Amino acid sequence: MLVAGTGNAGAFGEIVMSIAAVNARPLGLPKAQPAVPPVARPALQIRSSHDDKRKILFVTSELTDLVKTGGLADVSAALPRALGARHDVRVLIPGYSQVINSGHPIRIVGSLSGYAELPGCRIGRIDMPDGLIIYVLISPELYERDGSPYVDGHGNDWQDNPVRFARLGLAAAEIAAGTACISWAPELVHAHDWPAGLAPAYMHWRGLSTPSVFTIHNLAYQGNIDMSQRRLLGIPGEACDPERMEFYGKLSLLKAGIAYANHVTTVSSTYAREITTPEFGCGMEGFLSMKARQGLLSGLLNGIDESWEPESDPYLVSGFSARDWAGKQANAAYVRDAFGLEKRDAPLFAVVSRLVYQKGVDLTLDVAHAIVEGGGQLAILGQGERQIEAQVRQLAEQYPGQVGAHIGFNETDARRLFAGSDFLLMPSRYEPCGLSQMYAQRYASLPIARRTGGLADSIEDGITGFLFDAPDAASYRQAVQRALAVHHHPELLGAMRCRAMAAGFFWRHAIEPYDALYQQLLGERREVRLLI
């Protein structure tokens, strides 16, 4: 909707020790050891005084309030709000059809001229009910079309994606330069993932002193384009170098963000370490290792929003707490009914995930027999690759009453699965951060996960969940057997649930290292100005 206008427990300690003892040699199996050496969480060295709010612009391709394809949208919506008590944080997003037709009034507040083959566009402003300000990049020819932000209805990349997201990056640079006529300019720009990767680059090419942060949410998505498109996007020749944007004969929008930002972050400490190795580096491990040696790469764990509260969540059949598990049992009963599972008191395992290879769903199919043989039940919710979807359906047919599956996704069933299950399965081959394991712990469902990325950083093995190392069915099966062993000891299961629910995953805690980083970069900018 466009609107014309202008805009300026004592016993608990003993129980935890017992948990460790049970998990040390479960069913005769040795306890797993870390595949990646543990990485210390970032130490907070600078705390915001809150006295002087700084102006910060987030640049992102999706935002949960308006358009979402994955976890980037959740972070893009939650992190600015969490930081909003300390700073003036605003968000820039393309004006997709979903945004324009969201029902939120959009006031036109600025305009931008064309550059190279990037068209001119207008800037709209949405004022969300909670006070978050969103700038919308309005260009119908680039953004107002059916499909997702990145692909058409057939799942094919939009052919003009380089132009669409270069326009986003350039708009951020022009807003930072104060040339967008919106009566507001940021003191720091925070760009997210490859669609916003050119924002720090255009800022550099235009000689701006405004510091920038670039966050890698998933290194596997790189925004690689043909070298021939350089002139269309107004990319200078100097950028076509291995130390800048060049990547195996192409140009990478993700690498542009890494190369030109003042600081690079990713979404967990372990993932920050992993992406400097050949196994997880996706061809950029050398470049990222250099950034790490220079002290310019940090891993900052994501958080979750305040809506994940089991006592008051309106999506649940019944709320519950660590003092009263009746509500959890009510949600388990719903899950069994909705997924066609036998109504019996059995260990209930859940999958809430995209059904894709990265998430290790094929490994879950391999260990499902061990779950059923161990007396457990399995409920699967998700969608993704058609072959894996078909295999999930076949599994449910193979084990009627013990395995149930819904292909698709809805928030109500997802939250009730977290609340009703005993264990959440996350055998990801890699997981930059992951949020589901945090949701599960808040709702007393113990995650069983591979020790990788944010899973390693947010799950305490044998205390709040179960970790395994190798991405294979044998290691995964051992972790499942450990969980089944704990389920036979109700006092241990209860203690682990209580510990998991107490984990401090909310964004109000997670913003501290972001605030410290912003203050550091803004302080460095001030020092440079004083020297000049």
Regions found by a protein language model. Give the residues of each.
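Catalytic cores of nucleotide-sugar-dependent glycosyltransferases that transfer UDP/GDP/TDP-activated
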Residues: 2, 12-532
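Short linear segments in intrinsically disordered or otherwise low-structure-confidence regions
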Residues: 4-6
